[in-house]
C-alpha cells in the first residue's frame, strides 16, 4: 500500500514540475504582434521576411497571415516543415498525427529528449507556440486512415480554414506510409484541394516533393507505387528489429524544398515545381510534370479531370512584332538611326594604308588623302588673309 502511495506522490511531483515548466515558458514567450512591420530593429521578428517586398520578390508578404495550412504527419519532415512555416508567420497550422515522441526520434530534427512520451502534435504545438505566438495552431491526435477518422479529417480540411466553414489553403503530406497518402489523396480529390506529397527513401539518401492539382496533374492514385498497385500490406514488409534509415540532413533538405514551394504557391512568386526530387549521392535534382491518368481508380479524380477539361483555357496575349526598320531614316543632320543589333557595314581600308600595318592589326580610322588636305588648306587661306611668303613675314617682324 505504501509503495502505491509513493508512486502516486512521485507522479504528482512530476506533473507539478511539468506544469511549472510550462508556466515558465508561457511567461518568457513574447507578446503577440498584431501587424507585420518592415522596421529593422532587433525586436522585430519579421523584418527580414518583410525585406522580400523591398527586394521585389514578394508583392505583399503579410498575406501569409491569411493562409491556413494542414500538415499530416509530424515526424522527421513534418515537424521541420511546421517549424519553418511557423517562423515564416503562417496564419494557421493544423497538425495531424497519432504517434508519440520517442528517444528513437532524436536523430531527427525539432523534438527534444524531455518531450519523449508526449504525443507528437502536443509536443509540436508547445514548441511552435513558444517560437511564434502569432500563429494559430490546431492539433488532431488520431489516425486518418480509419473509416470514422477519415470523415473527421475530410471535414476538418474542408471547414477549418482561416474563416470557419472555409477550406484550408493547402495540405502538406509528410507521412511515411502509402495508406495515409492514399487517404490524403482521396480527401483532396473529393474536396478539390491542392496539396503537396513528400517523402524520404528508406535508405535516407533521396527525397522528393510532388505538387498535385486535382484534374490538372496526376494524383497519387493515377500512378501508384508498386506496394499500392499490387495491394501489398506494408506491415508484412517490416520485420522485427529492422527499420528504415533516416538522416536529419535529407529530411531537412526535403522539408526545405517543400516549404519553399508552398510559400511560392501561397504568396504567388516564382515557379512552383510539379515534381522535384533529390539524390544525396550525386546532388541530383530531377524535375518533371506528371499528367493525370484517364483510367484512374479514383472516381473523384476522373470528375476533376472532366471539370478541368471543360474549364476555359487562358487566352495568350498576342505580342506585336517590333520592326527592325529605323524610326527616323533621314533628318536635317544626315544621321541614320538603326537598331543596336543591326549589322554595320565596314569599309575596307585601302591597300596603300594597310601596307605598313602589322598582321592582326587594323586602322582605327581612315586618314584623309593629301590632296584633300592641301585643297582644304588653300581654301581656308583664300577665305582669310592674303598669301605672304616666309621671308616677307621675317622682314616685317624685324622692322617692328
Curated annotation (Swiss-Prot):
Keywords: ATP-binding, Metal-binding, Nucleotide-binding, Ubl conjugation pathway, Zinc. CDD domains: ThiF_MoeB_HesA_family (cd00757). The active site is at residue 243. GO terms for molecular function: ATP binding; metal ion binding; UFM1 activating enzyme activity. It holds the Pfam family ThiF. One of its GO terms (cellular component) is cytosol. One of its GO terms (biological process) is protein ufmylation. The keyword Nucleotide-binding applies. Zn(2+) binds at residues 219, 222, 296, 301. ATP binds at residues 76, 97, 120, 143, 177. Belongs to the ubiquitin-activating E1 family. UBA5 subfamily. E1-like enzyme which activates UFM1. This is Ubiquitin-like modifier-activating enzyme 5. It comes from Drosophila virilis (Fruit fly).
